[in-house]
C-alpha cells in the first residue's frame, strides 16, 4: 500500500500545517504520507479583496474536488477557512488542539491600536477584523491586505501600511517576531473567527482511515469549534463575512460570545451566553435567536454590498 497523500496549499504556513499532520500521522497512527501542493482560487487571485472574489471555499474548493476524485486522501486546512456545509461525502476527520486564537496588531512605528494617528492605514484580509477595528477607531482607514504572512509583513515594513492585523497562531507556528511592535488583542477586544487557531483535516467519510484520524482529534478544541461553526451555519454565514464567534470551556461551563456587523462598524450586534456544558448547543440556538431578533440577517445582507 502506498503512502497517503495530503493535499495542501503552497504557502509556508500551509506547508507547516501539512507537515505537522504528516509527522503526527507517522508518530500517532503509524501512517506514512506525502504532501501534494494544490493552488486554490484564493491563492491565484491576489489583487482582489476576498469578499469581492465571490463563492464559498476560496481556499478549500480545489482540495475538496481532489478528495472527491480520490487523487488525495486528506486535506489540511486552517479551520477558519473551512465552509460550514460540506460537499456530499466529505467531512472533518479531526480538529487539532487549538493554538492561540487571538488576532495580533503589528506595526513598525506605533506600539498599539490607540497610538495610531487619525486616518492611519491598517491592512487586514478580514471584514470581521475591519468591523471590530472600526468599532474602536472609526477614523482608521482599513484596507485589504492579501498574500502570505511574509508578503504582508514586507508591505508593512515598506511603509504601505501603518499597521496590519494577523492571526497570532500563524506567527507562532512560523516563529516570526513580525515587527518592532506586536500586541495581541484579547478575545474580549477582538472576537476571533470560527475555528481560528485550529487545523481541520477533511476526508471522504468512506475512507478507510477516516476513523483512524480521531487519534489526532482534540476533544475540547473540537467541541468549541463545532459550537462556533453551528452559530455561523445558523446565520447562513461563510468565511468571508463579518462574523466573529468564540466558545470557551471553564470546567463544566461554556461561554459563547459573538459579534457581527457592517465592515464600517456602523451597525453591530454583540452578545454572549454562558451555561452548563451539557446544554451548549441549546445556548448556541438561544444566541442565534437573540441575534436574529436584533436584525442579524438584515445586517449581513447589507454587508454583502461592501
Curated annotation (Swiss-Prot):
Its cofactor is dipyrromethane. The modification S-(dipyrrolylmethanemethyl)cysteine is found at residue 239. PROSITE patterns: PORPHOBILINOGEN_DEAM. Pathway: Porphyrin-containing compound metabolism; protoporphyrin-IX biosynthesis; coproporphyrinogen-III from 5-aminolevulinate: step 2/4. It catalyses: 4 porphobilinogen + H2O = hydroxymethylbilane + 4 NH4(+). Binds 1 dipyrromethane group covalently. It comes from the Bacteria. GO terms for biological process: protoporphyrinogen IX biosynthetic process. Its EC number is 2.5.1.61. InterPro entries: HemC, Porphobilin_deaminase_cofac_BS, Porphobilin_deaminase_N, Porphobilinogen_deaminase_C, Porphobilinogen_deaminase_C_sf. One of its GO terms (cellular component) is cytoplasm. Keywords: Porphyrin biosynthesis, Transferase. Pfam families: Porphobil_deam (PF01379), Porphobil_deamC (PF03900). GO terms for molecular function: hydroxymethylbilane synthase activity. Tetrapolymerization of the monopyrrole PBG into the hydroxymethylbilane pre-uroporphyrinogen in several discrete steps. Belongs to the HMBS family. Monomer. The porphobilinogen subunits are added to the dipyrromethane group. This is Porphobilinogen deaminase. It comes from Helicobacter pylori (strain Shi470). The lineage of its organism: Bacteria, Pseudomonadati, Campylobacterota, Epsilonproteobacteria, Campylobacterales.
